[in-house]
């Protein structure tokens, strides 16, 4: 009887536990209830992997391995069954006296480590755990980034590898300062071996766990390779003397620590019995090794990732880590999460079409119950200005329909592509934010104050000391700094030790007074740290160093940026206070400096600001937006030119396209341009192969009105279809649009498969079109060029003809450009005849901001700066000739 009751109770317990995770789909519940041994969760884009991580941790802590178990700590009773059945039926919590019967092999919250790639993701994970488990248990789970986890380990054990526990973390600027000193010591010419190239190679070595000794011992391919190894050794020696790690060292040195010290390794394997790693597809060799060293003998490791979103190969990530996980950890259970909760079917189908062309992947197909949604909008622009104008038009329409600026993201392959968009938006007065621009903590005044704070935390930090010893100016010149550096090296002490005893060194006799004054400032800062709160200490640094007085004097002299720099320092103090509020009694100077060193671009992205966001696709990883514009979908741009020569690189580019597509929730806009200027050179590009890989049924294509107008003269070939039984259909592509360069135009090209308008070159590999054409041009004048195109696929054939213009020199091209007007994108200089003119009181309508009234007008370089009070967004300033403005009457 007791056995029967226990079996009944176990069945009810399974039902009760399942109800606690009732919002999860079947595959997610499988992942949550798989508690022991290695687990690989292949989580597709938008599948809710954070939800799985949070719920899996919650299950480990609350129920352990109880689900699916046939065991109980004691025989079940009728009362147990009655109470549990009632809880299930009423949807209430089971009585506390049943807790012991509902648990089995539960895990203490402090025995769980969850590693993510961004502070933002770690923060979201912890916040959701607090809500699910309660504040105390949620806080005890260690959720952190790789680098933050390593900092925590090193703060405790750094002395085991010869570093102080108060070590400093160097950023890129600090590393370059160290390298300049190394180059001087080794007499290396930066022109022969650029510092950035040496730093990149050292970073690769650290990612691959190659020590300076191993680099020196390895046969070098050339002189530069051997020299870089010597630089690496000298660089690491200087960092150790300064008690500092660079960003790559945080993982590299932690791996060395764990590998070489079994007691440290055992401590963490026993402490963190369950390890969960997010974004595993983006781990490097060093991160893979770190994870394996932290994983205990029970192999309770769960990794979550998507091989189709592995896009950081250039940073050392290796997709093989996730592809080979099952081989490395025998007995792995693999679960695929393919249901997407973010996007519409058309968007997901487009993404699936693209990624299925990759071969190095586990394989999965995203699907959704969100509905079909709008088709993917593909726009072919004449050039990048036309592309920007089109995007502004679409955003304006969305705003009229009640949308918000922050709903829109413009994503691109490379940073250089943002300039035309930014320029157009600035002139049109469209609020926007570039993620990945200069960060707050990278501003000079902020870095200077942080350097002062750093030398108080770590007196051995000579690099930061050199930065600010004469900032503000104190009559401590470069020669004096070199003397101090040499003395410190001779005596094996820090530069601050020399400065504190400057009066004892004859070589410093001329600079004794400035140096001792600096020493007094340093001592006062130390006193401030010991006696005042951390934010008060930050304010003291700004005041006592003379930095505030320097900027106030600059402001009085009329320096334009002085007021902004003062405001930035005020914000710095606010940031320190916010850090103190978040960490309470655990707030320390070292902790604050760690936080700012580990902040990424995405961590500083403010989602609440109502502005269009511009960022690279790499930066957009993990984000989502209702409306996404994926620009520059052209051969040589996306995919990049260099990727064409490597199948591995091309597959990474395709994964990047997949990531970009899957950022969109409601609508996706993809654009390609016939002509694009990048890095000062204008080139004509074919549409990207990734566009051609999307099936026509999922997209809707339009093109620039200028291109439409040209097509009337044969600029774009008409589609022609000849279907042959047993063979593929043949279509003509954008045949005949000529390429103009050096006074001639070349013919167009055909394609194996075009859309209904005949201008996307599809089936790039299967049926590549061959174009033939000619153009005639005399230098100094523009002439017409006639091109014809031919394409075939299988047994089908397609033909088309086109007309193109070739402009033989820059003068003619510029003249012609004035004759072409783009909707919403005027030429750089508008002729007086067509210039817009506004007066205070004029009623206007803006494509983005809606209706408003002109309140002020100011002439500016043949244009007008117009100040407008808009009904919806208030006062905005914009350039008259660039803004998408239309005069209206009161009746309108």
Pin down the residues of each PLM region.
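P-loop NTPase Walker
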Residues: 1-164, 169, 266, 320, ...
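Conserved helicase C-terminal RecA-like lobe
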Residues: 217-221, 404, 418-430, 443, ...
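Short basic/glycine-enriched coil/helix segment immediately N-terminal to the Walker B
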Residues: 33, 37, 104-109, 256-275, ...
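Helicase P-loop NTPase motor core
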Residues: 47-53, 68, 73, 77, ...
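C-terminal accessory regions
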Residues: 633-874, 882-892
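Conserved helicase/translocase P-loop NTPase motor core
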Residues: 23, 80, 88-97, 146-150, ...
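ATP-hydrolysis module of ASCE/P-loop NTPase motor domains
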Residues: 35, 117, 137-141, 158-249, ...
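Conserved helicase motor core of SF1/SF2 NTP-dependent helicases
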Residues: 47, 281-360, 364-369, 486-489, ...
